[in-house]
Every structure is written in C-alpha cells, then in structure tokens.
C-alpha cells in the first residue's frame, strides 16, 4: 500500500482531532459535574489516558509498518492530539496562581508529568504484549 498523500493524512488528523476534542469535552464536563471545579480532574484524566493510549498505539502501529500511516494520522495525531491538552494544563496552573493556590501548581505538574511518563511506558509495554500475541 502506498503512503497516503499529505491531504489524506490531513483529513484523517482533522477527523480524529474532532473526535478527540469531543471526548475531552465530554470527559471534562462529566468530571466537573461529579467532582466540581476545585481541581482540574478532566484535564488530568484526559492527559493521563492519552499518555497510556499513545504508548499502546505507537508500539502497535509501529509493528504494522508503513501501512499504518493513515491510522497514525487518525489515532495519534488526531484523536490523541485532540484528547490531550497542554494549553489547558498551563491555563489551570495560572488559575491556581491567581486564586492563591500556588502550592497546587507543583503537585499538579508533578502528578501529570510523572504519572504521564509511567503511563506512556505502561502503554508501550501493553502494545508490545499485544503485538507479540
């Protein structure tokens, strides 16, 4: 199978991005309804979920070879890119600083980065396990 041309990959990434953004909105709204707005549970959840799924997909798609480029565009660039959000993470740190909760910034960043790294590694290992089956 030939690699898709750039515009095909662009359309796949845009479609996946719309799906990922919709998922982010739904997850965030659900967690705000359940836990309130005192802590950004939605952003933390989507970033950690996205880290794990990105690890799985990266290894799984890599094992499929060049024919996986359309799926990479759709799932990793699109869905995971739309689901996860660095800008919201930074904005929420600013909100913590502006509402006299600066101590939460370090905790939030540490949990996000350390758990995100652990989850992307766990996802990659899960992907290796899936490929080996």
Swiss-Prot record:
Please give the biological process terms from Gene Ontology that the record holds. Answer: cellular detoxification of fluoride
- Any idea where this protein resides? Cell inner membrane
Any stretches that span the bilayer, and where are they?
12-32, 41-61, 76-96, 104-124
Name-wise, this protein is Fluoride-specific ion channel FluC
Please indicate if the UniProt record lists Membrane as a keyword.
Answer: yes
Question: Where is it mostly found?
Answer: membrane
* Species per Swiss-Prot/TrEMBL record: Xanthomonas euvesicatoria pv. vesicatoria (strain 85-10) (Xanthomonas campestris pv. vesicatoria)
State the family named in the UniProt similarity comment for this chain.
Belongs to the fluoride channel Fluc/FEX (TC 1.A.43) family.
Activity regulation: Na(+) is not transported, but it plays an essential structural role and its presence is essential for fluoride channel function.
Gene Ontology terms, cellular component aspect? plasma membrane
Quick one: which residues bind Na(+)? 81, 84
The answer, when asked if Cell membrane is one of the entry's keywords, is: yes
The family database entries (PANTHER family) matched by this protein are listed as: FLUORIDE EXPORT PROTEIN 1-RELATED
Q: Which GO terms describe its molecular function?
A: fluoride channel activity; metal ion binding
Record-linked Pfam families: CRCB
């Amino acid at each position: 199978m030939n690699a898709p041309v750039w515009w095909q990959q662009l359309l796949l990434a845009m479609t996946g991005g719309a799906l990922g953004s919709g998922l982010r909105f739904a997850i965030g709204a659900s967690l705000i309804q359940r836990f309130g707005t005192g802590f950004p549970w939605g952003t933390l959840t989507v970033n950690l979920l996205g880290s794990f799924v990105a690890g799985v997909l990266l290894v799984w798609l890599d094992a499929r070879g060049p024919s996986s480029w359309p799926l990479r565009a759709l799932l990793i660039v699109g869905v995971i890119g739309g689901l996860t959000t660095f800008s919201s993470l930074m904005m929420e740190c600013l909100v913590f600083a502006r509402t006299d909760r600066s101590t939460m910034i370090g905790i939030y960043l540490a949990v996000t980065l350390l758990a995100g790294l652990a989850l992307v590694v766990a996802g990659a290992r899960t992907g290796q396990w899936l490929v080996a089956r």
